[in-house]
């Protein structure tokens, strides 16, 4: 269980939350542009400090911990792959800072690459990969961190419909197999409906209590009716 009870008041940033999120569930995070969706993920991951309140994961307070200690991984839209490194070296950064990779590390790397479907591409650099392959490589690196909370900040927005659907299905499969809690920011209601049973609406400086995705994205009377009606 991830329990959030916090407020953020810093310069132009305003955001508050009082919600609980169940483990082993995928949540979509939706709302108008500028509502605070990415800020919400940055707060959870530790890149933005809250003004007051708490963030509790499985009865452990984590709001005072650095990002590396929170059991949370985040995947961004730009993938953050180092262009001068091969896929193998990009992924290795998730498990070791040593130049020499141990046999155990090699096994972990191969397992992650197999899980996301890029085994055999380890010697390529990011520029030699398709957009879908880059997304899979970035996902593999995140999975190697072995955290149980996965945050997705529109990582597949630049992909075409077919590739994006493949990545969403892959996320669903991995989340189930690894028993992950997933929060995915998206501007596309169709993506939310495909992957998430529940949706968190971020609106008017508030992270609202999760509700059924179909209810949240009802275009005529849901909480985002005005927003969805203009898209």
Per-segment meaning from a language model:
Residues 144-148:
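A short, proline-enriched helix->beta-strand linker immediately N-terminal to the Walker B motif
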Residues 150-154:
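Catalytic Walker B motif of ABC-type/P-loop ATPase nucleotide-binding domains
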Residues 61-78, 97, 220:
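ABC ATPase NBD coupling module
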């Amino acid at each position: 269980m991830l329990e959030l009870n916090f407020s953020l008041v810093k310069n132009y940033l305003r955001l508050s939350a009082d919600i609980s999120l169940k483990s082993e569930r995928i949540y979509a995070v939706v709302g108008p542009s500028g509502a605070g969706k990415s800020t919400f993920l940055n707060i959870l991951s530790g890149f933005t400090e809250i003004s007051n309140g708490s963030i509790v994961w499985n009865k452990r307070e984590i709001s005072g911990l650095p990002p590396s200690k929170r059991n949370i991984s985040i995947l961004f839209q730009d993938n953050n792959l180092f262009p001068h490194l091969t896929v193998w070296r990009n992924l290795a950064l998730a498990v070791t800072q040593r130049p020499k990779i141990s046999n155990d590390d090699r096994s972990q790397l191969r397992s992650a690459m197999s899980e996301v479907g890029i085994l055999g591409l380890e010697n390529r650099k990011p520029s030699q990969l398709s957009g879908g392959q880059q997304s899979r490589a970035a996902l593999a690196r995140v999975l190697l961190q072995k955290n149980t909370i996965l945050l997705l900040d529109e990582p597949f927005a630049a992909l075409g419909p077919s590739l994006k659907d493949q990545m969403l299905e892959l996320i669903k499969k991995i989340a189930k197999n690894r028993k992950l809690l997933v929060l995915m920011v998206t501007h596309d209601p169709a993506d939310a409906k495909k992957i998430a049973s529940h949706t968190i609406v971020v609106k008017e400086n508030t992270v609202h209590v999760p509700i059924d995705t179909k209810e949240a994205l009802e275009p005529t009377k849901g909480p985002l009716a005005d927003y969805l009606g203009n898209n």
